Amino acid sequence: MIFNLPVSVLLYFSLIWAMEPSFVRGKNVVNLITFKDSNGKLHKRLAPEEIPPRLHNSQVNSYPLGYKGMRDFSRPAVNLDDILGTQQRKQQEFLAELSPLSLESKLSLVNEVQIFASYVRNDVETYNKVSDPNEDLIIIAPTNRAVSQLTLKPWQFPNNIDKLESDGATEKELDTAIQENISKFVRSHIVVYNDDKNSYKKVSPGCTLLQSIDFTESKKSDSETGGDILLKKEGEVYYVASSRDEKFHAVESIENGSNGVILMVDFTLVGP
């Protein structure tokens, strides 16, 4: 049987077929949030992690591949062994001039952390740091599996979005709460490293306590010490833990960028 479909219909299905890969995230298939505006009218929108990169906020970064110029080579590269006071492996030595891509570009190339990367893109301030070649960052990037296994999606906590909706929150209030949740999740996994050692403290041989962006933003005063992320090295393996439970997880892979390093781990530092 031959179907003579209108050209418009054929184009529609061709477009859907072409877009399909960008909407499939394994367990995280396209999810729609239903909410009411101030007039009680129902709306639907894509969950933040399902929004195609750079479509959620076009002002985030206008540079291709996250490239924002050359790094000041007088700035030393982030070196985990310097932070830990451990012996450096030769294969981890980093030459910035051979790897000009920023961490934002590196994140986009690691398939195993694309859910986390999508959250980073939806936190404008942090995204710009990740894209800046003259920042020095340590990104603890949870795998897609780790994020998918959370009982709530990162945009749903700690602000209780369901409760806000049932209490009649406005669209603006919901957007603000969701953005706060996204920012807190992202910033709980990123450390802004500086060489004056304000961002880390050695707690034992080969083990260092780091301060995430979220931790530093939540501090009541600059004199407050401590941290929320533990990083250690045993033999040739790096491990990461939350300071809350001190349960260490092995770093599965390390990616070096012009402005820091990405440590891929199969767990999240914060949860519902």
UniProtKB/Swiss-Prot annotation:
GO terms for cellular component: fungal-type vacuole. Residues 1-26 form the signal peptide. The lineage of its organism: Eukaryota, Fungi, Dikarya, Ascomycota, Saccharomycotina. Present with 4846 molecules/cell in log phase SD medium. It comes from Saccharomyces cerevisiae (strain ATCC 204508 / S288c) (Baker's yeast). PANTHER family: FAS1 DOMAIN-CONTAINING PROTEIN YDR262W. It comes from the Eukaryota. The keyword Signal applies. This is FAS1 domain-containing protein YDR262W. Residues 100-269 form the FAS1 domain.
